[in-house]
Amino acid sequence: LDREKKLNFFTFKWGTLYGPEYVNRLYGSIKKYCDVPFNFTCITDDSTGIRPEVLLLDYNQIGPDHWRAYGQDKIFTREKLCLFDLDIDGTKLWVDLDNLIHGDITELVSRDFEKPTFILNHWNIKKEHGMKWFGKGSDCHVNSSFVAWQDAQWLFDYTDKNLEKLMFTYKSLDKYLYYQHWRTYRLAFWEEGIVDNFNFSFPAHTYRDAAKMTLFNTSHIRIQRMGIEAFELHETEGQWPWDIWTSYDE
């Protein structure tokens, strides 16, 4: 890690859902669209095929041992929160692998962040009755696919202190953030229009000039059998994302 660089990107890759091309192309997209010197670290259980410019951390060593004692059905992707406990100066960001960056993000990542800054699902939250089921716990309008912060140690500490009851209560990281911290105004959000959703925005599968990045997360769509035509990045051949995504091999 080059500590002279005050901008640090992180991404996670474990299991077999996404290959190394996802890591390599995400790095390539940031290299193209970020004019600030940065470190890029992949936290992974398999570094095979990852380009040499990418720094590596062992996924099986990230975070406290007692966090790993819980199954992945408890606050799924909670590993991301361990990044708030890292002793690194400057601005930190995590970016999910299924996030296609296609616009300049230099201004975004150069901001001062008083609060950890997440994506708000604008494509869902304005729908009629979007907040109707808040008390039931079935909705979720916080998205953790592109997150920036400078000092958010409190979020790791709160989670660690209350780990047992939080693991009992929440199945996913985004729901934990939405129901536990969004309502207490401890989170900030990117402005509407910066992030788009390929499968959920209306009309779907459309390129939007104002967006800096587009999300392709499909797991919840398919698990819940929502009847939406949904594509992962590697399934978009013949559609507009494909040429952009594959260009980052260069």
Regions found by a protein language model. Name each.
Residues 1-25, 36, 42, 50-59, ...:
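A glycosyltransferase accessory/donor-loop signature
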Residues 43-88:
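Active-site-proximal specificity loops/subdomain of glycosyltransferases
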